[in-house]
Amino acid sequence: MEISWGRALWRNFLGQSPDWYKLALIIFLILNPLIFIISPFVAGWLLVAEFIFTLAMALKCYPLLPGGLLAIEAVFIGMTSAEHVREEVAANLEVLLLLMFMVAGIYFMKQLLLFIFTRLLLSIRSKMLLSLSFCMAAAFLSAFLDALTVVAVVISVAVGFYGIYHRVASSRTEDTDLQDDSHIDKHYKVVLEQFRGFLRSLMMHAGVGTALGGVMTMVGEPQNLIIAKAAGWHFGDFFLRMSPVTVPVLICGLLTCLLVEKLRCFGYGETLPEKVREVLQQFDDQSRQQRTRQDKIRLIVQAIIGVWLVTALALHLAEVGLIGLSVIILATSLTGVTDEHAIGKAFTESLPFTALLTVFFSVVAVIIDQQLFSPIIHFVLQASEHAQLSLFYIFNGLLSSISDNVFVGTIYINEAKAAMESGAITLKQYELLAVAINTGTNLPSVATPNGQAAFLFLLTSALAPLIRLSYGRMVWMALPYTLVLTVVGLLCVEFTLAPVTEWFMQMGWIATL
């Protein structure tokens, strides 16, 4: 019997999302106009809370859909205007270009990145050194590339290796269902469970590595570019400005990596089983023998393009997004990718998030029009200049750990810039606040997958169920890093940021605009 029209409409609305989630969104959409009539300020804060809720529930439904509905309604009822949304999007065009072109550009360098991580995995036998290498490699790559892409590459390596051993363990060469363990005997299951633990720890080290490296440069995370643009910094300026906080945090983060592996705590310490290593090594040897000159040329070309990418970013030869576009053109031209559909695949990872970011800017427009953050900013600015840095860091950290850090970073840097332009703070203080906002947005956000897009990408990937990586387990494994990165970052903002920045100015390395 066919379902009713109403039931069909209900099922289509937000698709497979739970009924309670659909009902919650409908209630939000009904309440917002009613509350806006009574108190625009309260309605504005309610919208922000609802939007954060959609980000926190990203596993139930991609936030673009519910967040987009809320944003459309906000414009429709007058909380902001379509013109203001356009202005916010135009002001952040560089970030949108970064997401569209840089992420797509790195897609065409995946073979090189896969090669690097595969060599690391099979060449280093010490688990402590391997974990450190993965963390450092992810940090270095994320300083120049998009963190999502770096994590995507590591996921590809892990899924590939898991599939190789799973086929051997199940004695089925055509094993397509990697979640089906029914054909694996008891002995192999023990080894497989150990292998899962090994992959879980490597993925978490790599994920945290992207946060450690991503905070250091203006292209490491999308919000970094927003903050750099607001402060008028180029690549070198941004790196030096952040270094009083980010360099000590990087060192402590890498020491944490070694410590958790040494103590075998928080789910770390599992080694690669020897039987698995033998299977993977055999497969890698076969792959290398089958690699043609054409394949080798592709790797060499991608490495040269990587050098171009780093050089162009460091010398600020063009806007970041345009450098990404040059990577697409060079990589496709020189590696033989000429089909439109093959090129189109490169954009599938970045465009949904680009659309979501545009919705962020709609909510930012509401925040500005309704002056939602004015009381908070007023409270912070009442404190001494020294205390302002820590307060901005803490407020950013709290919100970033449960919400998307692009959203949070954009809000706070806009408010700080408005305070500077109104004369409430000096330009020098504003530049220090920009560092506190950037580090506060990036570092504590490793606490949950909601804050770090790379973590959320890992949690929703095909790999997560294979290696038994749940939301709770990810939060638990991230806990030592969360504590170390947050506390060390706060101490650096409190004690080293101002004096080291002053010393940099005296040396002539940086200058106030």
UniProtKB/Swiss-Prot annotation:
The UniProt GO MF terms for this protein read: sodium:proton antiporter activity
What are the UniProt keywords, alphabetically? Antiport, Cell inner membrane, Cell membrane, Ion transport, Membrane, Sodium, Sodium transport, Transmembrane, Transmembrane helix, Transport
- Name the predominant localization: membrane
Give any Pfam family that matches: NhaB
Question: What topology in the membrane does the UniProt record assign?
Answer: Multi-pass membrane protein
Its GO CC terms? plasma membrane
Q: Which residues form the signal peptide?
A: none
Q: Which reaction does it catalyse?
A: 2 Na(+)(in) + 3 H(+)(out) = 2 Na(+)(out) + 3 H(+)(in)
Highest taxon of the lineage: Bacteria
**Residue intervals passing through the bilayer:** 23-43, 52-72, 97-117, 144-164, 202-222, 238-258, 303-323, 348-368, 391-411, 447-467, 475-495
Return the InterPro entries for the record: Na+/H+_antiporter_NhaB
The cellular location(s) given in this protein's UniProt record come to: Cell inner membrane
Is Glycoprotein one of the keywords?
A: no
Q: What does this protein do?
A: Na(+)/H(+) antiporter that extrudes sodium in exchange for external protons.
- Please give the family membership noted in the entry: Belongs to the NhaB Na(+)/H(+) (TC 2.A.34) antiporter family.
Q: What is this protein called?
A: Na(+)/H(+) antiporter NhaB
Source species of the chain: Escherichia coli O7:K1 (strain IAI39 / ExPEC)
This protein's gene is called nhaB
